[in-house]
Amino acid sequence: MLRFIIFFSLFIHLCVAAPQTPAAAAAVPAKKWLTLNGQEPAVVARGGFSGLFPESSASANDLAIGTSSPGLTMLCNLQMTKDGVGLCLSDIILDNATTISSVFPKAQKTYKVNGQDLKGWFVLDYDADTIFNNVTLVQNIFSRPSIFDGQMSVSAVEDVLGTKPPKFWLSVQYDAFYMEHKLSPAEYLRSLQFRGINVISSPEIGFLKSIGMDAGRAKTKLIFEFKDPEAVEPTTNKKYSEIQQNLAAIKAFASGVLVPKDYIWPIDSAKYLKPATTFVADAHKAGLEVYASGFANDLRTSFNYSYDPSAEYLQFVDNGQFSVDGVITDFPPTASQSITCFSHQNGNLPKAGHALVITHNGASGDYPGCTDLAYQKAVDDGADVIDCSVQMSKDGIAFCHDAADLTASTTAMTIFMSRATSVPEIQPTNGIFSFDLTWAEIQSVKPQIENPFTATGFQRNPANKNAGKFITLADFLDFSKAKAVTGVMINIENAAYLASKKGLGVVDAVKSALAKSTLDKQSTQKVLIQSDDSSVLASFEAVPPYTRVLSIDKEIGGAPKPSVDEIKKYAEAVNLLRTSLVTVSQSFTTGKTNVVEEMHKGNISVYVSVLRNEYISVAFDYFSDPTIELATFISGSGVDGVITEFPATATRYLKSPCSDLNKEQPYAILPAEAGGLVVVADKEAQPPASAPNPPLEAKDVIDPPLPPVANLAASNATGGAQSHPPPASGTVANAANLGLSLLAMLALGV
């Protein structure tokens, strides 16, 4: 079928990049796992790669096998048709995962299932041919791609077994309900003679006991599934919380248990981890394996994980105290890389690639940006280069802060609302600007963690949203020397405005601070000077140890030689947006530019920014996984550095042996094929093609010479004295800013 031809072309690079022999794996020290049997935890794909494609579709199953570690287990949720055919579908009700409600709009029914009345379209009301010939699958989680809806057929159990997955797990959720309606999952399994079925799980004790002898003869493992602690198990009429009190009794009919992950690592109401329970230790003591369910890259889970799905897996398999025996996941490649590549690293492996990990305002995904805590976290997380965007106070103090406007990342609005002004040379909206406040006034406000995705309800580490303190440029440089980081990046913006309108020489302030720190006279630590103004970079030409970085803050589609030649007059590197390297439309990558290659031909290094962990900022092609995005830019595009708000994620990837595609190994973290996923969908379902980004023009690189610093020193030397704008303009500014002020106060909870 054409669909499969296209689908497999998407992943043909797997055959190219995968090792031909696992011989090199022998050089890797064997890992010691704290599982029941000491073996590596299993990766169990719930319905294949159901995080992208509809659950248990052929595409979901094929992609799971093609992108996961070799020992993958495929999980199928068994549902039964009226004529006794077994299907792989997420639930007994079909309307959330198929097109059945539009095919048979008046066929809705109500059944009592495990004591509850459920309304919908039930699979047992239809024979298999009706399902296969009329009904197609849809994605049943609305944050996931919908462009594949209605294009993929429902899979029978035999269809999935026919793909010969490494291991196969059948989940039987509703035995008692089916038995009430004269359908027997046990007899269905006997008709298959349990062939190819490695694991069977169920939340019903009676069902597991009924197939115990048959499963034993077939060497099929039986797993008892725990539901919500307050739910009632149908056979015993006991709550699952009661059954949990006697795990040893489960050993009589099962070899392991499957539990929601919060049975092991509970999360409090503020979405932070509570101490681990003793569930795994208790189950292992009883001789039971423990499998944890509920893993997905696109779920909002504990803030402790910093939106990094790999960090969550590691919490369950590599915490130094215990390890679960397997994880049930909708994104099997992420589980595979976490277990195979990231576990037992202990932070001491050398980085596999040469790419630099450069921070964006320190570890600003975890703490307010440009604070002492954000920088300390960045160092702890292994960042190579920490950055300081230099702002100037009214009294001439250079300090680190993301922008001249303090409203988004401080509590300035609650104190200095009346000082909001309009500076169109800097931004189109009103703001409270650092150059209108003294350093003492700036220190009187609290930092505030920035949430780029607040509009979608995403928060960042709210327990520390106002933690830390601002630091001066001089203190930042002292810190970087004391911590012996590989380098620092000093970002300079608005230099012309500050010099001509405010009498503040930010370039001179940076030069002076670097000279006092002696970083201008050594080669041990890198010094990167970044600006979007070529004249600023030109002023640092006389200091050879510095690497000058031109920040290009617009999307470009190419870098012709004249433009690259112009850049070389001012800079040795560029900082480019992600979408200048890989184009994206509606969260799908659509293509790859040649900008990196064109820059490299001119001996210009390329850094890409800004990388974030939140899954809504990560394209579907990257599997909603920030690690795959890193691999795409580093291994795929060949960038020289990544600028990130979550340096721990980037460092973990680069320290993993799986990031080095030149080594033969059983598993590798591969870059995504830009534009490869969207073509799997029918043409009419694909997002509309967008116009290509224009190439960078040479004239876009050139900026006017910097003006001299205006002689406003006398007014700027008044310390804490406040200079108010003229009444007329001040009134206009305050009135224009009233809406902004009220919105900011509401956002801050004032």
Curated annotation (Swiss-Prot):
EC number: 3.1.4.46
Enzyme class per UniProt: hydrolase
Biological process annotations from GO: glycerol metabolic process; lipid metabolic process
A molecular function GO annotation: glycerophosphodiester phosphodiesterase activity
InterPro entries, per database record: GP_PDE_dom, PLC-like_Pdiesterase_TIM-brl
Reaction equation(s) it catalyzes: a sn-glycero-3-phosphodiester + H2O = an alcohol + sn-glycerol 3-phosphate + H(+)
Acyltransferase listed as a keyword: no
GP-PDE domain ranges (all copies): 41-339, 355-654
Family: Belongs to the glycerophosphoryl diester phosphodiesterase family.
Keywords, in A-Z order: Glycerol metabolism, Glycoprotein, Hydrolase, Signal
Signal peptide from the UniProt entry: 1-17
Protein name: Glycerophosphodiester phosphodiesterase GDPDL7
PANTHER family per the UniProt record, alphabetical: GLYCEROPHOSPHODIESTER PHOSPHODIESTERASE GDPDL6-RELATED (PTHR43620:SF44), GLYCEROPHOSPHORYL DIESTER PHOSPHODIESTERASE (PTHR43620)
Superkingdom of origin organism: Eukaryota
Tissues where this protein is expressed: Expressed in flowers and siliques.
Glycosylation-annotated residues: N134, N304, N603, N716
Pfam families for the chain: GDPD
